[in-house]
């Protein structure tokens, strides 16, 4: 039996969220979070419109160059995506300060995803949330059982479930949990890791990493996750967004 996600205006019911990860101005899907891996899938705005036309209610937009290097080389491409769609956009990648986060929220992004910045300064969560309630998602990317930061290159020693509970107390509106070890590999999910995070908090948990089949989507739904981010499986046509939304 599915535990069911917490009541939330963010995700009123379980949702499948297409990923639009941008590197050098193009959509890419990395394997295991490693630079130079994976495949390219074209123009970000075209991809975003494709998923909205297919029924997406939320888009997961990530600036990979920002995540790895902290630069804003993709700023124009990312802004074009936000302006082109009329659905919720959650944005992450290279957001290092409360000023960065607030500026994005002021210019049309619905939710900001804080990863490295939240680990380095947990108070940033409350600082942004005070001005923009229900708009801060804390990203916990796990590799080898610990939270990793700085483009998935540095270990922190933090346990994902324990970290999730801490950020809930800091004011996070949701947790994005990414299993980097299986990200982009199309080899399936590790639902026990997701379930640990879900059980640690009373805010929505968005699961990401490893989805390759509709059964993977169903498995993550049954953990009580509020939503699942799907990238490679959708781009490669393993299933359609409509099929996933019927799970």
Residue ranges and their predicted role:
Residues 1-17, 244-247:
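Haloarchaeal acidic low-complexity proteome signature biased toward cell-envelope/secretome components but also
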Residues 15-19, 57-58, 86-90, 110-113, ...:
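Structural preference for beta-strand elements that scaffold enzyme active sites
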Residues 58-74, 176-187:
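Glycine-rich, proline-tolerant flexible connector loops at the mouths of alpha/beta enzymes
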Residues 82-112, 193-228:
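Catalytic cores of alpha/beta
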């Amino acid at each position: 039996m599915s535990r069911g996600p917490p009541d939330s205006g963010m995700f009123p019911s379980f949702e499948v969220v297409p990923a639009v990860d941008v590197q050098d101005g193009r959509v890419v899907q990395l394997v295991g979070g490693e630079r130079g891996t994976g495949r390219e899938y074209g123009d970000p705005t075209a991809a975003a419109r494709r998923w909205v036309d297919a029924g997406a209610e939320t888009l997961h937009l990530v600036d990979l160059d920002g995540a790895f290097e902290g630069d804003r080389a993709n700023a124009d491409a990312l802004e074009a995506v936000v302006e082109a769609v009329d659905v919720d956009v959650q944005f992450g990648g290279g957001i290092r300060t409360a000023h960065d986060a607030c500026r994005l929220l002021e210019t049309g992004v619905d939710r900001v995803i804080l990863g490295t910045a939240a680990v380095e300064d947990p108070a940033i969560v409350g600082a942004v949330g005070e001005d923009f309630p229900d708009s801060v998602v804390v990203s916990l990317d796990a590799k080898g059982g610990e939270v990793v930061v700085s483009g998935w290159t540095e270990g922190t020693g933090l346990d994902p479930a324990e970290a999730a509970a801490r950020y809930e107390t800091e004011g996070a509106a949701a947790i994005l949990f990414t299993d980097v070890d299986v990200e982009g590999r199309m080899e399936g999910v590790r639902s026990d890791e997701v379930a640990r995070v879900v059980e640690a908090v009373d805010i929505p948990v968005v699961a990401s990493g490893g989805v390759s089949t509709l059964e993977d989507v169903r498995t993550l739904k049954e953990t009580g996750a509020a939503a699942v981010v799907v990238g490679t499986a959708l781009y490669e046509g393993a299933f359609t967004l409509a099929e996933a939304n019927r799970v």
